[in-house]
From Swiss-Prot:
It comes from Homo sapiens. This is Testican-2. Contains chondroitin sulfate and heparan sulfate O-linked oligosaccharides. May participate in diverse steps of neurogenesis. Binds calcium. Residues 1-22 form the signal peptide. Highly expressed in brain. Also found in lung and testis. Disulfide bonds join C90-C101, C95-C111, C136-C166, C139-C159, C148-C180, C313-C337, C348-C355, C357-C376. The lineage of its organism: Eukaryota, Metazoa, Chordata, Craniata, Vertebrata. Residues 387-424 are annotated as: Disordered.
């Protein structure tokens, strides 16, 4: 007689236990979320699960579309179960609260944010599981040729860029082929015998300009996505130590890279800008930023590295190219620069045939202008400080001579005092 009663009691208890477990899972998911962590910015930082066994570092600049949100249907199969094309891959994929599952064919599933699905283009080839009716065109992994988008992010193909534009409802275009940042007219990186060429001052200056433009694109894109406010902690400390000239995309990028929030960038943090394959001068550039040679870059060193003035001769050449190129006036003097962007010792005007000697800053040495080639090595060689016209003196000898002269003067004054007397 008790068996039916027990059955009626067990069923409600089981339902209550199942409800408690479901509530616990929901709380665990909520606690596991990372609220406002700027290192989880979907636009250009990948998640911690993207460590590579080969690369041995966290590639924060990985293609945003090719991230861990894409799951393989084959990985979810158990044992030797045969592939069933009638099954839905989204059946075994659990997305977070704010995402919905999209089936791409019968082997792949993708969890997409609901916000990104608000303005999608409807595609009948891809099925959406949720209350959204539109979807963006999928991309095939075989068609890979990286491009740099107008938002400053690198995409594995043009299709990926178009897909991201569709997902985010943004107008994106290809800035250049290959990864970001887009190169300008790059000088040759190797000599005729195949040996690598050292990075000159002009190479480092050009690289700094490209990186600064790239950082600005990333910063603007972050503002549009509303993720700039999530870095208020590190940025507030940064603002206290940086000058006004560095409170822009340069300072913002520093706070992004400074994961330890100690206002220093060590080699591990700098390695997040993984461009060694495409920018041969990237490591020499960051090494040049470390003016104290302590193995890390401070906030002041970082700002100075990007806002330092270009060498004078190189800056003059660029000014001539910008201002004088359109006028096309004949007889314009073009200075001769060395490999580091400073003036060569001898400068010549091709139109008049006159030559003269200058210092590194381009200041003409008096009396050196002549019709021909002056011997600037002998003229400038007299000066220890190049181009100053003043020879160095031995400070110790100079101090010894001055001390001797002072001693003689004191002896002379004492003698004059002893010889003094009265005439009666």
């Amino acid at each position: 007689m008790r068996a039916p009663g027990c059955g009626r009691l067990v069923l409600p208890l089981l339902l209550l236990a199942a409800a408690a477990l479901a509530e616990g899972d929901a709380k665990g998911l909520k606690e596991g979320e990372t609220p406002g962590n700027f290192m989880e910015d979907e636009q250009w930082l990948s998640s911690i699960s993207q460590y590579s066994g080969k690369i041995k570092h966290w590639n924060r600049f990985r293609d945003e579309v090719e991230d861990d949100y894409i799951k393989s249907w084959e990985d979810n199969q158990q044992g030797d179960e045969a592939l069933d094309t009638t099954k839905d891959p989204c059946q075994k994929v659990k997305c977070s609260r704010h995402k919905v599952c999209i089936a791409q064919g019968y082997q792949r599933a993708m969890c997409i944010s609901r916000k990104k699905l608000e303005h999608r283009i409807k595609q009948p080839t891809v099925k959406l599981h949720g209350n959204k009716d539109s979807i963006c065109k999928p991309c095939h992994m075989a068609q890979l040729a990286s491009v740099c988008g107008s938002d400053g992010h690198t995409y594995s193909s043009v299709c990926k860029l178009e897909q991201q534009a569709c997902l985010s409802s943004k107008q994106l275009a290809v800035r250049c082929e290959g990864p970001c940042p887009c190169p300008t007219e790059q000088a040759a990186t190797s000599t005729a015998d195949g040996k690598p060429e050292t990075c000159t001052g002009q190479d480092l200056a050009d690289l700094g300009d490209r990186l600064r433009d790239w950082f600005q694109l990333l910063h603007e894109n972050s503002k549009q996505n509303g993720s700039a406010s999530s870095v208020a902690g590190p940025a507030s400390g940064l603002d206290k130590s940086l000058g006004a000239s560095c409170k822009d995309s340069i300072g913002w990028m520093f706070s992004k890279l400074d994961t330890s929030a100690d206002l220093f960038l060590d080699q591990t943090e700098l390695a997040a800008i993984n461009l060694d394959k495409y920018e041969v001068c990237i490591r020499p550039f960051f090494n040049s930023c470390d003016t104290y040679k302590d193995g890390r870059v401070s906030t002041a060193e970082w700002c100075f590295c990007f806002w330092r003035e270009k060498p004078p001769c190189l800056a003059e050449l660029e000014r001539i190219q910008i201002q004088e190129a359109a006028k096309k006036k004949p007889g314009i003097f073009i200075p001769s620069c060395d490999e580091d962007g400073y003036y060569r010792k001898m400068q010549c005007d091709q139109s008049s045939g006159d030559c003269w000697c200058v210092d590194q800053l381009g200041l003409e040495l008096t009396g050196t202008r002549t019709h021909g080639s002056p011997d600037c090595d002998d003229i400038v060689g007299f000066s220890g400080d190049f181009g100053s016209g003043v020879g160095w003196e031995d400070e110790e000898e100079k101090e010894t001579e001055e001390a001797g002269e002072e001693a003689e003067e004191e002896e002379g004054e004492a003698g004059e005092a002893d010889d003094g007397g009265y005439i009666w």
